[in-house]
Every structure is written in C-alpha cells, then in structure tokens.
Amino acid sequence: MPQKVLYYEKRHKEYMEQRMEISLRPITEDNFIDAFNLKLAREQERFVSHPIRSLAQAYVYREQCQPFGIYQGERMVGYVMVIYDYDVPEYDVWHMMIDEAQQGKGYGKAALAQVLAYIGQKPFGDSGRIALTCNRDNAKALALYRAAGFAPSGNEDEDEIGLVLNI
C-alpha cells in the first residue's frame, strides 16, 4: 500500500510541475501568427479546426469567448478556445490542439488543467457545466478528456462524441 501512495504522490507532483510550466495566453495581435503556424499531423487534420477558422469564430463570438495560445515557457505549443453558451448555459472547449512537434510531452494534459482552472473562475457567466465534442476516432484526445473526468453527454453524430464535465 505505501508504494501506491508514493507512486500517486510522485505522479501528482510531476503533473503539477508540468502544469506550472504550461500557461494560457490570450491570442492578440502580437501572437496570432504563431497560432496560424501551428501544425497537426496530416491524419489529425480532420479532428480539429485550424486556429485560422477558430479565430474567425472568436471574432463573431467575441463577447462570450476567449482564444488562447498554449505556451511552454515562451513558445506557443498549442491552441484552445473557451466559449460561453448563454442559451444553455455552459462553457464549451473548442478546437484544442497541440502542435505535432510538441505532442507526447504532456502539454495537452497540462493545458486542459489550465483551461479547467480558467473556467472555474466563471469569466463569462455562472455555470458548472463544461462541454466539448471530440472526433470518435481521436483516441488520444478521448483518453485525455475521460481522464480529466469528462463523460459522454449523449450527444453524438456520425463523427463526433459529446462530452461533459460538471464542476
């Protein structure tokens, strides 16, 4: 039993250290080109919209969303957008991606923790519900979201699965 506790403490410490080196920074005129330059592997391109499209949506929904660059130190390694749906009400996580050259380093997990902390501040409105959709073939992303506590919402289409987390 003590070995399991030590293992958990070690893993938790590693996770927290990793989370601390990852930060979210709003997309601005100073860094939007870095977001445009993020790349996915060819087989991943069908899983998530490119930041160019996402930033166009951010402009339309600018009163209720925040696009972020995901940074490791001073380098943008990914992108994510948080949007508040006043009609439901709920927070939605859109277009989360980690650059193909930066994948497999735990940045997605650390960034998701930062996103959840941001949403926990309720920047746009009061809701304890967080929703997202994920391509059913994106096994790595599905595993990430499920490990964070997201569960199927019951909303599905032929390509995507809806997931929800209540906080």
Give the location of each predicted region:
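Short glycine-rich hinge loops at helix-strand junctions in the catalytic core
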Residues: 106, 124, 149
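Conserved beta-strand-loop-alpha-helix junction that forms the acyl-donor binding cleft
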Residues: 126-142, 158-161
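Active-site acidic-Proline motif in GNAT/NAT acetyltransferases
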Residues: 99-105, 136-137
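Conserved N-terminal entry element of GNAT/NAT acetyltransferase domains
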Residues: 2-30, 166-167
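Active-site helix adjacent to the Tyr-X3-Lys
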Residues: 110, 114, 132
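Acetyl-CoA-dependent GNAT
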Residues: 21-95, 99-101, 112, 118-124, ...
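Conserved active-site alpha-helix within GNAT-family acetyltransferase domains
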Residues: 109, 136-154
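Short, well-ordered beta-strand micro-motif
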Residues: 69, 162-166
